[in-house]
Amino acid sequence: CTGQGGFFGDDEPEEMPFEYDLTIEDMWNDIPINQTSASDIINMTYDFEKSPRITNLTEIGYSMNGQPLLLVEFGDYDPAIPTVYFVAAQHGNEPASVDSAYLLARHFARGSPEEVDPILEKINLAVFVMVNPDGRDAGSRGNANGTDLNRDHMKLLEPEGKIMQKAFQKIHPSVTVDMHEFGGAGTIIFQVAAPQNPTTHPDVLAASYVLETDVIEAINEEWGFGSVTNYPPTTSSQDSSIHRNHFAVHGSVSL
């Protein structure tokens, strides 16, 4: 579903009418059969600028190959309520994370007031729709340099790693969700992992585990087939250069 027709095929309107008539059920019907290109996702995300719910739509930086990296922010950034931050597609060969983040941002930009407005009264929301557009286009796990961006949060050798740090410092999120995709046709469809680095503040770890449990319970109630992953902890899963571990160490409840 690439090319001029974009995410919605040839029916995509030139002007996005923000009539707020989409429901969550509508979103599932808009999921494409074929993967969109990085430029498709970028161009469609720019359309969100027309939504009055958007606080900021920022080109927060550029990928190794010069593609814009977009951060979408909703809400008034009231310090009295939590900020929830979604990050998608550090790994370019995990397309579902980008599509999910795009649909999430689209729902909050265009969704019905009955579904969206009560949530935005309780949280500030930020969505980093696509961290690794070069990897998405190449179908590769790493960025254009072949680097696994989810192992670059300590050294910050890559531009995308630096930009993720910049976004985090801009937002100061209460909760951070790092979105991935796992292959294989098994019985476990949804996997959730909490931070495991032992230097994380105990309160952040405890809150992350509560959130992990709540998410798994909600998944299993709605769809089933949810599971905790990376447990028990290993040396690899405790790596401080992994997104959920790194930003939990910096005080954000993380998954």
Where do the protein language model's features map onto the residues?
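M14 metallocarboxypeptidase catalytic domain recognition
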Residues: 1-255
